[in-house]
Amino acid sequence: NLHVISGIQNFVVETNEGINLDANLIGFDKRSDLAILKVTNENELNLNSIVFAKKKSISIGDKVYAIGDPFGLGLTVTSGIVSANNRNTGNPYLELIQTDAAVNPGNSGGALINENGELVGITSKIFSTTGSFSGISFALPVDKLSDIASEIIKFGLAKKASLGNFSIRSIRILHNNQLKYCGEIVNYSSGPILDLFETHERLCILKVNEEPMSLERLRLVLENAFPGDAITLTLLDNMGELHSYKIKTDSI
């Protein structure tokens, strides 16, 4: 996890045999709290990579194991079940796995594996009103992890989501006898947003992911999303008719 290595300049990875390996930071992504390190002398030890579980293979009730170094005690494995999938803890596009496997300081960034030893997620955080483990922990699922990690390894960062090149003109309109704020889409020239105007001459955004439209709301949704994620726009056309579209984002 990115929060684990923040502020650190030199990195050392310790194997379960107690061997220390120097490592370099390849890149990171703040949205997912993910960082990628690469050990510099991996060939000397013939290290094996963990097998990723198939995407969408984890179900509620499945047995899972969290591996980490809680409180610096050393390699520790705790067990639990998948309590829920697609949890939103601030960013709905991360769709975190919720488990009841014990997670404490030192577990962050550790593997969450299934009974076959396959990686299903990376432990990232807990929910607690006391600061201590309360039976609710979260992990970034392998579905998102593999996509984000691949981009970090290739580009040094994970690309941002985009709806294309366009501007928003803030206006107020009267709809259903109510005065509402609306973001009119103007100066559109490319990207997924352009497809909307194949059947419409003028469009105003009333809602973004079912929440009232504002420039800040649209910015935050795009900031949290990843390329390929869908954003739901509720639109009003020039005839006064409402439309709802799920638009798959592009990358920038």
What are these regions (language model features)?
Residues 9, 107-110, 184-185, 192-194, ...:
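Short loop/turn microsegments at loop-to-beta-strand junctions
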Residues 120-121, 206, 243:
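Generic structural signal for well-ordered beta-strand positions
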